[in-house]
């Protein structure tokens, strides 16, 4: 269900409600960090995703597991919000709600999400250079980098910001040269 229109439509009002609560308490960034942690946990554990999505498992069991797993590691307002999602049988949309909340937070803080694919892990200097370049291109105040490694790129990076793709990879350059050579003959 990840990324489906249906889950986005259901997740949006919950994410907006969470954002309203966070703004009223001046904890938007703290809740954002907690949402990132939850997304990391969900991404790492297919078993947890299946557990919270299962209609067979009792709500009290879901609450217990979430409390044990997240405990005091997340803000108590978010923990209460998760319990509400369990009670309303909307916990199945937790991933979509967290993703939507982070999108709202990026909009609020004039932050862009950039997906960067490189052939090797970026050094701190390279990360700074990429962030500076993205800020210059987009006018954003800050940049959230999501990095991925693809050894097939040979060298360079591919940067995706929204629907724009900047291909500065060696593989991309070779492909463009190949296209221009085949088009010239």
Curated annotation (Swiss-Prot):
Pfam families: OSCP (PF00213). It is found in: Cellular thylakoid membrane. Keywords: ATP synthesis, CF(1), Hydrogen ion transport, Ion transport, Membrane, Thylakoid, Transport. It comes from the Bacteria. It is a peripheral membrane protein. GO terms for molecular function: proton-transporting ATP synthase activity, rotational mechanism. GO terms for cellular component: plasma membrane-derived thylakoid membrane; proton-transporting ATP synthase complex. PROSITE patterns: ATPASE_DELTA. F-type ATPases have 2 components, F(1) - the catalytic core - and F(0) - the membrane proton channel. F(1) has five subunits: alpha(3), beta(3), gamma(1), delta(1), epsilon(1). CF(0) has four main subunits: a(1), b(1), b'(1) and c(10-14). The alpha and beta chains form an alternating ring which encloses part of the gamma chain. F(1) is attached to F(0) by a central stalk formed by the gamma and epsilon chains, while a peripheral stalk is formed by the delta, b and b' chains. PANTHER family: ATP SYNTHASE DELTA CHAIN. F(1)F(0) ATP synthase produces ATP from ADP in the presence of a proton or sodium gradient. F-type ATPases consist of two structural domains, F(1) containing the extramembraneous catalytic core and F(0) containing the membrane proton channel, linked together by a central stalk and a peripheral stalk. During catalysis, ATP synthesis in the catalytic domain of F(1) is coupled via a rotary mechanism of the central stalk subunits to proton translocation. This protein is part of the stalk that links CF(0) to CF(1). It either transmits conformational changes from CF(0) to CF(1) or is implicated in proton conduction. Belongs to the ATPase delta chain family. This is ATP synthase subunit delta. It comes from Crocosphaera subtropica (strain ATCC 51142 / BH68).
